[in-house]
Amino acid sequence: MSAVVYFSSASRNTERFVEHCDFPSCGVNVFRIPLQPNAAPLNVREPYIIIVPTYGGGDARKAVPPQVKRFLNDPANREWIRGVIASGNTNFGEAYAAAGPIISRKCHVPLMYRFELMGTREDVHAVREGVRRFFSDTPTD
């Protein structure tokens, strides 16, 4: 099994991007990290790639959404992460998609791709095919 885990704010930019990728059609499960802090926590027990937006308005110290931090602070969830894909806003210069490299470093996984806001058609294609190839070429245990 393989999965994509994503977080999307109320803007739904990341959610729409993930929907356009149509991961289930290539055999990849999709799980959303809850937006509301009082929601039941998400527990993932299969290899996954995480897709995250960047927060903080250019402040890299606030780049990773708190909900994502909480999810990854669970050792059982962190055990299954295999890569990270980040979105961001190029208006923030050096902090563009900064959540990706932060998670990549802390979890010792590759930063696989970055895209702006909701992504383009080309981004959707690249991510969908990249995720499909990654899980078909990489042992999942």
UniProtKB/Swiss-Prot annotation:
One Pfam family linked to the record: Flavodoxin_NdrI
Gene Ontology biological process terms, A to Z: protein modification process
GO molecular function, one term: FMN binding
Superkingdom of this protein's organism: Bacteria
Protein family according to the UniProt entry: Belongs to the NrdI family.
Protein's job: Probably involved in ribonucleotide reductase function.
NCBIfam families named among the record's database cross-references: nrdI (TIGR00333)
Protein name: Protein NrdI
